[in-house]
Amino acid sequence: MDSSEKELIANLKSDGNREKAFKILVKTYQVRLYWHIRKIVMNHDDADDILQNVYIKVWKNVDSFREDSSLFTWLFRIATNESLSYLQQQRRHSVVSMNEISEYLVESLESDVYFEGDEIQKKLQLAIIQLPEKQRIVFNMKYFDEMKYEEMSEILKTSVGALKASFHFAVKKVEEFLKEEPK
């Protein structure tokens, strides 16, 4: 943790500088957090809502942040947990199978006016959607966010070995999907 991050945390925890520090936090991490969430839930509006929930949790709980990890890691852990909670809540409220959830994610991707990828990018996203939830998150964090396994381990509370295995299997499944998909 560098000195500017320590200063930001101190300001977030002090009443006098809290709002200004919070604006800096939002400006610094908003884009990365949004895209991390978006890759999990696949929908712009849902990602925006979840991001707001993340900020509310951070605002309410910053005083309990123990600084065992970096601020970035703590924020990503909250964003990941909020995203997974959202998906679990969606599953509970609607009695649907995993296939139906995958179909919903595919439909969301195909009808998303904010998706700007070409056909190759779309095929990759379709392949990623087919992955089990945990593998999808690990793949996105490693491939797109270029996170180190140690960082991912802190965020996901999973061993480095398990993350490497998840990523390996995810890559194999994505490769298979891309080979099978018509060009």
Where are the regions a protein language model picked out?
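N-terminal module of bacterial RNA polymerase sigma factors
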Residues: 1-32, 183
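Internal acidic/polar
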Residues: 2-7, 93-117
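Sigma70-family region 2
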Residues: 14, 42, 55-70, 90
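Amphipathic, Lys/Arg- and hydrophobic-enriched alpha-helical face
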Residues: 26-44, 61, 128, 173, ...
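Structural recognition of an alpha-helix C-terminal capping motif at a helix-to-coil junction
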Residues: 35, 49-56, 69-81
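Arg/Lys-rich amphipathic alpha helix in sigma70-family domain 2
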Residues: 64-66, 77-97
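DNA-recognition helix of helix-turn-helix
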Residues: 73, 124, 135, 150, ...
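A short pre-motif secondary-structure segment
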Residues: 138-142
